[in-house]
Curated annotation (Swiss-Prot):
Family, as annotated: Belongs to the ClpX chaperone family. HslU subfamily.
InterPro entries xref list: AAA+_ATPase (IPR003593), ATP-dep_Clp_protease_ClpX (IPR050052), ATPase_AAA_core (IPR003959), Clp_ATPase_C (IPR019489), HslU (IPR004491), P-loop_NTPase (IPR027417)
The entry's keywords: ATP-binding, Chaperone, Cytoplasm, Nucleotide-binding, Stress response
Protein name: ATP-dependent protease ATPase subunit HslU
HAMAP family: HslU
Highest taxon of source: Bacteria
One of the GO BP terms on file: protein unfolding
Subcellular location: Cytoplasm
Alphabetized GO MF terms: ATP binding; ATP hydrolysis activity; peptidase activity; proteasome-activating activity
Organism: Acidithiobacillus ferrooxidans (strain ATCC 23270 / DSM 14882 / CIP 104768 / NCIMB 8455)
Gene3D superfamilies (alphabetical): 1.10.8.60, DNA helicase RuvA subunit, C-terminal domain, P-loop containing nucleotide triphosphate hydrolases
Lineage: Bacteria, Pseudomonadati, Pseudomonadota, Acidithiobacillia, Acidithiobacillales
Amino acid sequence: MSEMTPREIVQELDKYIIGQSEAKRAVAIALRNRWRRGQVPPPLHQEITPKNILMIGPTGVGKTEIARRLAQLANAPFIKVEATKFTEVGYVGKDVESIIRDLTETAVDMIRNERQVALRQRAEELAEERILDILIPGPRDSSVPRSDEGTRQKFRKMLREGKLDAQEIEIEVSAPKGGVEIMAPAGMEEMTNQLREMFSNMAPGKTSTRRVTVSEAQRLLTDDEAAKLVNEEEVRALALERVQSGGIVFIDEIDKVAVRSGTQQGSDVSREGVQRDLLPLVEGSNVSTRYGVVKTDHILFIASGAFHLSKPSDLIPELQGRLPIRVELEALSAADLVRILQEPENALVRQYGALLASDGLALHFTQDGVQRIAEIAQQVNERVENIGARRLHTVMERLLEEVAFVAPDGSTTALEVDAAYVDSRLKDLAQDEDLSRYIL
C-alpha cells in the first residue's frame, strides 16, 4: 500500500496530466485514506469504507488517465470498464459481476509477476545448472570425480562471461497448457472459464523440446524455473487480499445508463437495471470468482461521464448516494493543449521526436509551432466535436504524415516544425469544415 501523502500523489499526477487540480486532490485523498484505514485498529477499520468518486467532464480532459496513473502509484489491481457494455441480469450480454472477476484475474497476474521477480535470482541459478547439465552430460552425484567438477566450473565461468552465448543447445521447457475452446452464450463467461480450466488440468503437464542459442536458453529456462518456484496457492490468497483491500474499478460512460427524466422508454428499463445491478457491487457484496469469494466492501469505484444529455441527478438515488464525492473537470483551453504537448513526461512532441530519431531524423518543435498546433486542435474541437486532448493525436499524425513516410529514405536528417510549417500542412484543412469533419 502506498504511503505517499496527498501532496506527493498530486505531484506525481502532475507529471502526466495537465490541470484538473480538483480531481487530482479528490483521488489523492481517496488513496491516502486507504493507507489511513490500514493504521486503524480492528474492529473499526472494517467499518471504514472508501468514498467512491463521480468525475463529471467532457471526453479527453484526463478522467481515465487520472484513474490509471493512480492505480500505478498505488500498485493496485485496476480495471477500466464501460457501463454501456453491461446488461441487466436476464438480458443477453455481460453481467456486472464480470467486472470483479476480471479485476481478480488482473490481481493474480500482478502478484504472480511480483513473485517471479522476487525469485528471479534463484531461478537464474537453477537455469544455469540446467544449461551446464546439457553442455557437460553425465551423472551429477557424490561419485563424480573432482576433475569433472573442475570442468563444470570452467564452463560456468565461460557461460557467465558470455563466451557460449552463440552456441546452440536443445532444451526442454514446460509447454503451455492446451486451450480447450468452448462456445457458450453471452453472459456465461465464468462457467466456460471453469470448464476450460477443468479440461486443461485433466491433461498431464507436457514439455516441449526446442533448439536455441545458449543466451536464449538462459531466458527461457529462467522463466520456466521462476514459474515452477511460484506457489500458486500463495498467489491466489495474496491476490484476493489485494483486490479486496486495494482494488480500483473505473466505470466510464456512466452517464449513458442514466435515464433522463421524462423520457422513459423501453430501452431505458435495461439501463436502470444496469444501475441496480451495479448497486450491490458499489455498496459491498460477495462475488464468486474462480479464485474464491471477493468482498467488494473496500474496493474503490471511480465513475465518470460527460453528462451532455443527462444529469448526475438522473442516476437512481441509491447509486448517487454511493458516489458521494463529485468532481467536475474543466474543458481544455488552447493554453492547456500547449502545455499537454510539451510538459508531461510522455509529451507528444517527445514521443514523435523519439520515433523519428530511429530513422536518423532530428525533429525540433519551435514554441510558435507548438502554439499553432494547439490553436488548430482547439479550432477543430470547437467546430466539429470537442474530444479534448485526443484531438492532438489526430492533428500530429496529419502534420507529420509526409515526413514519417520519407524519413527512412535519408533525404532529410533534420526538420524544424514552426508555425509556417504547421500552416503549410494543416491550415487549409483546418479551415475547410467539411474536410476537417472527416480528416481531423
